[in-house]
C-alpha cells in the first residue's frame, strides 16, 4: 500500500561525495528521507554516469530495492556547459545527445522525472537566436521523452529567462505536451520580484515536484535555512490548499562540509517543523 506521507527527499550534493549508491541511499534512509535526487552536472565525472554499463545501472536499481529509498528524479544541469540554445552547432548537438542519454538512463533505472535547467545559454551572451534554438531543442527533447514515458520538468531558475512559473508556463503551453511539466524552486522563485503565492497557484496542474531551499536577492545557493527571504510556511500552505500532493526535495550543497550528515539532519528538522506549522500534519 502506498504511504500517505508527504514524500521528502534530499539532493545528492547534500550527502558525502562518492559513487557508491548503496551507501548513499542507506545514509538517506538513516536520515529519514524517502528519496534521493541524482545530479548529472557539467563535470566529466557526473556526466560519465550517462555512459554507465548495464551492470552499473543494475547496481543502482539493486541499491534502490535493497534500501527502499527511491531515486525518482535527476537534476540535469549539464546543459550549462552544453546548452540547447548554443549558436555553436557542435555544442548544441552535444546538448541534445546528453538529453537523449539522460532520457535513456532514466528509462533504464526507473527515474520518472528529469529536472531541466532553464538556460538558453549560460556562459555566452543570450539573444533571439539562442532563445529560438532553445525552444527548438526543448521540442526535440520532449519528443524523445514522450516515447520513453519520462517527464521533463523545467526548474524555476536563477536566470531571467525562466525566473517565474508564469514564464515556464509559456513554454508548457508552447510545447503542449503532458511529458513537459514544471519543477519550481521556492527559493529561486522568492529571490526575484515575484508574487510567490500567486505564482504557485498559477502552476497548479503542472507542478510535479518542488525544490526547497532558502535564498536572498542575488544569492541563490548556500543560504542557511531561516536566514533568507523565503516564507516557507506560506509556500507550504499555498501548495497544500491548491491540492499539491507531490514530492518536496531539500536542495543543499553540503557534500564537502565537515559533517554533511549533521548539516542535512539539521535542515530536515527545520523544514519538517515549517511543514507542520503549515498544516501538513503528515510531515510532522
Swiss-Prot record:
Catalytic reaction(s) noted: L-ribulose 5-phosphate = L-xylulose 5-phosphate
EC code: 5.1.3.22
Pfam families in the record: AP_endonuc_2 (PF01261)
InterPro entries: L-Ru-5P_3-Epase, L-Ru-5P_3-Epase_Enterobacteria, Sugar_Epim/Isomerase, Xyl_isomerase-like_sf, Xyl_isomerase-like_TIM-brl
Pathway this chain belongs to: Cofactor degradation; L-ascorbate degradation; D-xylulose 5-phosphate from L-ascorbate: step 3/4
Keyword Glycoprotein among record annotations: no
Tree of life domain: Bacteria
GO function terms (MF aspect): intramolecular oxidoreductase activity, interconverting aldoses and ketoses; L-ribulose-5-phosphate 3-epimerase activity
Gene that specifies this protein: ulaE
Keyword terms: Isomerase
Enzyme class, UniProt record, top EC level: isomerase
One Gene Ontology term from the biological process aspect of the record: L-ascorbic acid catabolic process
Entry's family note: Belongs to the L-ribulose-5-phosphate 3-epimerase family.
Reported function: Catalyzes the isomerization of L-xylulose-5-phosphate to L-ribulose-5-phosphate. Is involved in the anaerobic L-ascorbate utilization.
Protein name: Putative L-ribulose-5-phosphate 3-epimerase UlaE
Induction notes from the record: Induced by L-ascorbate. Repressed by UlaR.
Alphabetical list of PANTHER family matching this protein: ISOMERASE, L-RIBULOSE-5-PHOSPHATE 3-EPIMERASE ULAE
